[in-house]
Amino acid sequence: MRLLALFFLALAGSASAQKAPYDVFPEAAPPYYRVRYEASDKPGELVYPVNYTVWVPPGVKALRGVIVHQHGCGEGSCKSGLTGAFDLHWQALAKKHDCALLAPSYEQPDKAECQMWCDPRNGSSAAFQKGLVDLGAQSGHPELSKVPWALWGHSGGGHWAGGMVLMHPERVAAAWLRSGVPLLEANPSRSTIKTHTVPETALSVPIMCNLGTKEGVTVKEGRFAGAWASNEAFFTAVRSRGGLIGVSVDPFTAHECGNQRYLAMPWLDACLTARLPETSGEPLKAMPAEKAWLAPLLGTEAAPAAKFSEDKTKAVWLPNEAIAKAWAQYVKDSAVTDTTPPPAPTKVKIKGNEITWEAGADLESGIASFTIERDGVAIGSVPEKSANPYGRPIFQGLQYSDTPVQPLVKMVFTDTKAEAGGKHTYRVIAVNTVGLQSK
């Protein structure tokens, strides 16, 4: 109780300061919806304010699920959640499966205890489910409160997503845990973290433990060097009981997300395709065991489960052949291949010398940029220069916790060299992150 009282004192003493950095975020106009809850001083409830933003695919008749993109700990990561629902690439995955895309932003103060939200038992599970009810009412999709969840989490968000699997396995279609997992055995050096138990029903939920090689796999020192020990312990405990769990190690990164989305998207796509019921309200379907592939832990080659000769209870589980091949490429150089061009931009409009358009992302490789042609000749690109310190260049930019940068990049180009009064034909071409162009 004393620890909880200290949290409330810290919050009360800095309440006015908590408007920043959480007070700057994109407008939520349909198909975006937002709810925000203040901090609670009631035992067991969420002690931090939280902002939930959801995107609902335009025209969807009935939602079949919700994809949750959960940030990590600390102010920098928490505020990055404010743009998560606006990510065009994650929207492409959601749209394919008639799912909503939801991104929380827990307003954790600087240096405050992350466990007070990233352990879902501390009120964030209940707040999340209340958010689904309220957002369902706002959007006209009350089924949002009942559909299955596909969870993605980074760092403390991985801890949260894994905890939600263990608390609500019947609701979770799949969970991708980037650099964070629930603790199953007490760690004396991290006494604020409470342990979880793994129920039998959680063993049928597909889980991927994903982390960087510099988080204790090959680099044994540094702030995040303990991540591998936690991931290995969680993987071993779940897999030894037959759980559907894998491990994928980014060969270049530390705690930053890097290029993980190019494996996470296909992996979640495969799991949602296999598990989502055709009719909303029906139970999740089981993963087809006959399609599974296995690989040695920290290995680089996978094989069909029926042909895997090593101990299967210690092997990385992969849902099918296509994902096994993408996984092998990812753990080698993170360059997951793609041979499909992105969708062509639509609703291209010219007003004076300003060109605007709309575009959806390529599910496999997202959007890197747009090329603008005037009369068949390229005259510029948006953005002019694409820089991403954490992985492939992305049109919307990429923050540490895998969300677009603010302010959101607009789909607009000004032709400053067009002849006044001249008639021109313009074309906008989408370019994905492997360099393929729309047709």
What annotation goes with each model-predicted range?
Residues 241-243, 251-346:
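Alpha/beta-hydrolase-fold serine-hydrolase catalytic core, especially in secreted/extracellular enzymes
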Residues 60-112, 184-185, 217-219:
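Short substrate-entry loop that stabilizes the transition state in hydrolases
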Residues 173-261:
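The feature captures the conserved acid-bearing segment of alpha/beta-hydrolase catalytic domains
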